[in-house]
């Protein structure tokens, strides 16, 4: 039996930007009727490679073959003509148009007689393409009435109208519920059966092993290898991605606990927290687990002063404090890293340095009330080095950094204020495995230095691996607390769903 021809073959692809070589002699293969995972840490070059394939960027060197024939991708239009479509993490549907108008946007069907758009034909063809992916939605509905999962189906149907043979999906389940994710997997299976090659980018390992057939790995802008999914496990895949074996994903450090740092008594807020009481010591990481909507983030935001408490007391170092707003919390040494770093944690249009000192500008005021840029720059460079922020310089826009490095910048912003209590909400969401371990090591260092840390996470292995104690919330209340040595996923989930033994 002869060797099968891949649907897609990229050979020797290189791409440079000013000051950085993003891709260096990268190769990639994907087969029709298969789902190929494209893996790598943030900054490995995945997005750049896919932007070259989909016509957003032009390659400096290299060749692209589709079914053995070399093609020249000069732009988005030529990529689509070659049968290549990308479905971005941020969906590009237009909410003010109907489903059929979105599906055929730029490719409308016109009446032979009037020259006007043939709405009836658009609706009929839209229904046909939607049925092909098992989606039963009225094509006349406005896209604004759809949920995220349904909007994603519109993007996939749109790809089919362009005779897509290769569909790239970039972090497709990030904003989906569990039910929507399962529906997407069914659609991917239907596409696969049609002979379409799917390139699937995700940080979620469980998804890779569930739906993918092969994996292609990039590391530091270079090709790091490929494998059949059946031939590798989680540890081998991580080793390919980071270039080293991660024996221990969660480097827990046991340190001596200090005095009581934070005490919360009977705290409530109208956003959903009901009578929460707990303590936190210096040199301790308190993990908070719970299902979505359990009140974890609301509790954090109430302590931080973003939400107004309706009852309860907060004490710091044994003395009651009054927190009515965020500045009250910051002035008392309480800082909060939001679960949504792009919307609430940083300003994407500002530089790394500007984001770092944003909350601490008064420190750099001279007697003329202007900024002492030299002193500011010294502190910025210190933290860039101290917590290993990978950036060309402090002037780089934070939006150009990987998720892990953005998180480090936000952490540095708060560390510059020397907080006593640090609340971190979903600290490694959307961050690759290598950067995760760096964040964990950093939290361990902060704990060892006497900081009191609250870590909210939906990742149970993370909560179990890093925390000294675990507090579980359910429906706005604290449903239980577990010591590190007695906690496991089952005991946490029982408390999370309200089963108290």
Curated annotation (Swiss-Prot):
Catalyzed reaction equations: D-ribose(out) + ATP + H2O = D-ribose(in) + ADP + phosphate + H(+)
Binding site for ATP: 40-47
Swiss-Prot/TrEMBL keywords: ATP-binding, Cell membrane, Membrane, Nucleotide-binding, Repeat, Sugar transport, Translocase, Transport
UniProt superkingdom: Bacteria
Lipid bilayer topology: Peripheral membrane protein
Keyword Cell cycle assigned: no
Keyword Flavoprotein listed: no
GO molecular function, one term: ATP hydrolysis activity
This enzyme's EC code(s): 7.5.2.7
Pfam family of the protein (one): ABC_tran
Cellular localisation: Cell membrane
Chief subcellular location: membrane
Residues covered by the ABC transporter domain: 8-245, 255-500
SUPFAM superfamilies per record: P-loop containing nucleoside triphosphate hydrolases (SSF52540)
SMART domains: AAA
A single GO cellular-component term on record: plasma membrane
Biological role stated in the UniProt entry: Part of the ABC transporter complex RbsABC involved in ribose import. Responsible for energy coupling to the transport system.
Subunit annotation: The complex is composed of an ATP-binding protein (RbsA), two transmembrane proteins (RbsC) and a solute-binding protein (RbsB).
Family the entry assigns: Belongs to the ABC transporter superfamily. Ribose importer (TC 3.A.1.2.1) family.
Annotated protein name in UniProt: Ribose import ATP-binding protein RbsA
The gene coding this protein: rbsA
């Amino acid at each position: 039996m002869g060797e099968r021809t891949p649907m897609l073959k990229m050979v020797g692809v290189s791409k440079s930007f000013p000051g950085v070589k993003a891709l260096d002699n990268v190769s990639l293969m994907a087969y029709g009727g298969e789902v190929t995972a494209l893996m790598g840490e943030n900054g490995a070059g995945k997005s750049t490679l896919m932007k070259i394939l989909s016509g957003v960027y032009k390659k400096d060197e290299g060749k692209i073959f589709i079914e053995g024939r070399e093609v020249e991708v000069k732009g988005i239009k030529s990529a689509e003509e070659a049968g290549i479509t990308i479905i971005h993490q941020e969906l590009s549907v237009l909410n003010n148009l109907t489903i059929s108008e979105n599906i055929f946007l730029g490719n409308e069907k016109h009446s032979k007689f009037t020259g006007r758009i043939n709405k009836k034909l658009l609706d009929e063809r839209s229904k046909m393409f939607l049925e092909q992916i098992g989606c039963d939605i009225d094509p006349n509905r406005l896209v604004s009435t759809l949920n995220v999962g349904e909007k994603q189906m519109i993007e996939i149907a749109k790809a089919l109208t362009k005779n897509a043979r290769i569909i790239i999906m970039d972090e497709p389940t990030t904003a989906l519920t569990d039910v929507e994710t399962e529906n997407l997997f069914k659609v991917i299976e239907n596409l696969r059966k049609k002979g379409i090659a799917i390139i699937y980018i995700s940080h979620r390992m469980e998804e890779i092993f569930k739906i993918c057939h092969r994996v292609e790995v990039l590391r530091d802008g270079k090709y790091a290898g490929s494998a059949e999914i059946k031939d590798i496990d989680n540890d081998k895949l991580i080793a390919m991605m980071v270039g080293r074996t991660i024996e221990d994903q969660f480097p827990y450090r046991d340190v001596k606990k200090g005095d009581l740092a934070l005490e919360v008594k009977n705290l409530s807020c109208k956003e959903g927290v009901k009578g929460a009481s707990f303590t936190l010591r210096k040199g301790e990481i308190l993990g908070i687990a719970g299902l979505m909507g359990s009140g974890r983030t609301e509790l954090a935001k109430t302590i931080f002063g973003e939400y107004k408490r309706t009852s309860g007391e907060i004490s710091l170092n044994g003395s009651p404090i009054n927190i009515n707003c965020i500045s009250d919390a910051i002035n008392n040494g309480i800082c909060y890293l939001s679960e949504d770093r792009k919307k609430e944690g940083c300003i994407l249009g500002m530089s790394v340095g500007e984001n770092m000192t944003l909350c601490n500008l008064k420190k750099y005021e001279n007697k003329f009330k202007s900024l002492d840029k030299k002193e500011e720059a010294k502190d910025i460079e210190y933290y860039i080095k101290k917590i290993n922020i990978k950036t060309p310089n402090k002037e780089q826009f934070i939006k150009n950094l990987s998720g892990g490095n953005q998180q480090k910048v936000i952490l540095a912003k708060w560390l510059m204020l020397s907080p006593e209590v640090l609340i971190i909400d979903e600290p490694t969401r959307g961050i690759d495995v290598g950067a995760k371990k760096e964040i964990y090591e950093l939290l361990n260092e902060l704990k060892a230095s006497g900081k009191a840390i609250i870590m909210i996470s939906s990742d149970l292995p993370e909560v179990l691996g890093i925390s000294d104690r675990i507090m579980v919330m359910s429906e706005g209340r604290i449903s239980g607390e577990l010591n590190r040595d007695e906690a496991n996923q089952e005991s946490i989930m029982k408390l999370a769903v309200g089963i108290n033994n």
